[in-house]
């Protein structure tokens, strides 16, 4: 799973998702991409599940790019613990995905295979998405 090698701080504020994405809104590598419609927090496990689903559908042909990286530590308190006594330890990493952000890109497979792979990947993600394509 994706996680940062080093962090400046162990715990992060909860934060909010930005209104619309300022960068990463256009296709940079592939011919087909998965673009978010909602803003939400996507975990490293969800990204990995989407990657596995897409590569399995592509039968390991072509190329898949992951354009988001989980860099925000999310902390959680254990089950059945009373309120207070600190924030809790970091459990997993997530990324705040803004509306309009490209999350996955695909190149090197037929159109119907790419569309099916991105549909399968989008089913694993908590955000609503749409598939975009490059017009040349």
Curated annotation (Swiss-Prot):
Keywords associated with the record: Ribonucleoprotein, Ribosomal protein, RNA-binding, rRNA-binding, tRNA-binding
An example molecular function term from Gene Ontology annotations: tRNA binding
GO cellular component, one term: cytosolic large ribosomal subunit
PROSITE patterns xrefs: RIBOSOMAL_L16_1, RIBOSOMAL_L16_2
Example GO BP: translation
Tagged with keyword Ribosomal protein: yes
CDD domains in the record: Ribosomal_L16_L10e (cd01433)
UniProt subunit comment: Part of the 50S ribosomal subunit.
Family as reported in the entry's similarity comment: Belongs to the universal ribosomal protein uL16 family.
PANTHER family according to UniProt: 50S/60S RIBOSOMAL PROTEIN L16 (PTHR12220), LARGE RIBOSOMAL SUBUNIT PROTEIN UL16M (PTHR12220:SF13)
Protein name: Large ribosomal subunit protein uL16
Organism of derivation: Rickettsia peacockii (strain Rustic)
Lineage: Bacteria, Pseudomonadati, Pseudomonadota, Alphaproteobacteria, Rickettsiales
Gene this chain is encoded by: rplP
């Amino acid at each position: 799973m994706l996680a940062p090698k080093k962090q400046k701080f162990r715990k992060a504020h909860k934060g909010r998702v930005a209104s619309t994405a300022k960068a990463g809104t256009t296709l940079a590598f592939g011919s087909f991409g998965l673009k978010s419609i909602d803003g939400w927090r996507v975990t490293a496990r969800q990204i990995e599940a989407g990657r596995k689903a897409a590569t399995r559908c592509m039968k390991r042909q072509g190329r898949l790019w992951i354009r988001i990286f989980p860099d925000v530590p999310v902390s959680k308190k254990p089950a059945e613990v009373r309120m207070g006594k600190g924030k809790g330890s970091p459990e997993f990493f997530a990324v705040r995905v803004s509306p309009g952000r490209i999350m996955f890109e695909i190149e090197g497979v037929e159109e119907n295979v790419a569309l099916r792979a991105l549909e399968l990947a989008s089913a694993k993600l908590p955000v609503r998405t749409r598939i975009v394509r490059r017009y040349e």
